[in-house]
Amino acid sequence: MQPRVFLAVTLLALLASARALETEDASLLGYMQDYMQGYMEHASKTAQDALTRVQDSQMAQQARGWMSDSLSSLQDYWSSFKGKWSGFGFWDATPEEASPTPAPEGI
């Protein structure tokens, strides 16, 4: 084999292997990009779910606080209202102490 032909074949083999490595690198790069994109989407979804749970928990705590405050306020109002009208004896009577209403005659 002549040195020129050998040199040309060697050069073509090097170019072909370089092209194959470049294609392999490109496919590996594409794979890594897809992998990282999937990872970032998963991490983003996980973070969003965690944030939603925290917000739901905070909203539930705030709602419980509002309900507790409202109930306490209502109890205070009822006690105040009852205290104002307690002088009439209306609130002090129990159902057993209340006199029964007589039945109308003729029934």
From Swiss-Prot:
Gene encoding the protein: Apoc3
Lineage: Eukaryota, Metazoa, Chordata, Craniata, Vertebrata
GO biological process, alphabetically ordered: cholesterol efflux; cholesterol homeostasis; chylomicron remnant clearance; G protein-coupled receptor signaling pathway; high-density lipoprotein particle remodeling; lipoprotein metabolic process; negative regulation of cholesterol import; negative regulation of fatty acid biosynthetic process
Family to which this protein belongs: Belongs to the apolipoprotein C3 family.
Posttranslational mods: The most abundant glycoforms are characterized by an O-linked disaccharide galactose linked to N-acetylgalactosamine (Gal-GalNAc), further modified with up to 3 sialic acid residues. Less abundant glycoforms are characterized by more complex and fucosylated glycan moieties. O-glycosylated on Thr-101 with a core 1 or possibly core 8 glycan.
Organism annotation: Heterocephalus glaber
Highest taxon, organism lineage: Eukaryota
Name under which the protein is recorded: Apolipoprotein C-III
Alphabetic keyword roster: Chylomicron, Glycoprotein, Lipid degradation, Lipid metabolism, Lipid transport, Lipoprotein, Oxidation, Secreted, Sialic acid, Signal, Transport, VLDL
Keyword Lipoprotein: yes
Compartments where found: Secreted
Sequence positions bearing Methionine sulfoxide: 67
Main function: Component of triglyceride-rich very low density lipoproteins (VLDL) and high density lipoproteins (HDL) in plasma. Plays a multifaceted role in triglyceride homeostasis. Intracellularly, promotes hepatic very low density lipoprotein 1 (VLDL1) assembly and secretion; extracellularly, attenuates hydrolysis and clearance of triglyceride-rich lipoproteins (TRLs). Impairs the lipolysis of TRLs by inhibiting lipoprotein lipase and the hepatic uptake of TRLs by remnant receptors.
